[in-house]
Amino acid sequence: MSEAIRLTQLSHGGGCGCKIAPAVLAEMLKTLPQAQLFPDLLVGHETADDAAVYRLNDEQAIVATTDFFMPIVDDPFDFGRIAATNAISDIYAMGGKPILALAIVGMPVNTLPIAAIQKIMEGGASVCAVAGIPLAGGHTIDAPEPIYGLVALGLVHPQRVKKNSAARAGDVLVLGKPLGVGILGSTMKAGKLDAEAYRQLIDTTTQLNTVGTALGALDAVHALTDVTGFGLLGHLLEICRGSGLSARIEAGRLPLLPAAVEFAKQGIGPGAIGRNLASFGDAVAFDAAVPEWQRRVMADAQTSGGLLAAVAPDSVDEVLALFHAQGFAAACVVGELQAGEPRVGVVA
């Protein structure tokens, strides 16, 4: 980590915790026109999916997304890596394969040394190289706070697109990465994160969700999303609302970053936790036995979080094997979808 520059002190928020709260975002989007005039637009903004999908022909559709945010860590290179990993994840979350990226760069050029900005951009480029795609260009502006991210493009078969609206009653919910990223990010901003906790933070946030491409080829994976700024509960609610289903989550089965547990019990976390919980309202019901710290973890804003898959029950073992084979050791079953009103019930 850089000792000379603390990127997290140059911004008011960090990572996907910068997202506007779900309820506020929904209000903002109300006046946007629907997309009925574009029959080849397979996925637009109406279903809260991770990316737009536009059919090119019977065999190919383009997946398009953009994602950017302010620093969640102090090290410039790591910030670039995390932001790029997070942006490309949306392609995988649609079942697609990334093909190209463009950089989005907003930097306080009179405050932040050029060398630090270069490291941020190099970090992003390094992740694109791992993903096997070119960082082909981008756009830069002078901004009061550091902002970095990508436009990412990918390809998917039009019949293999994984939408939030396609989950089915009885589907089992599989989560690919442990929770607690936002909590560790807030701990770092407070200057309380040790080297081991930082390693856990970096390891999970720079792991590309490459398994999404393989999951996209499976008919048994009915819906797929990545868990980011709205937390596990918020993104699960998007699936519930899109598919007209209810969900049941078992808090005791959730994979957690070990270093995040104690900080969560201390009440440390981003402001997005409170905003998310307030936005859920009565759409989320917690069993009395679920402790407050676990409730906060489930609403914690994840940056570059894991994939959440809705899977046919008889294919759960196959899906878990795919996750584990690609290095997602924490992947596990966390709940199920049921017929009912779009809401989430959480039991201990």
PLM features: residue spans?
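Helix-biased detector of long, well-ordered alpha-helical tracts
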Residues: 1-348
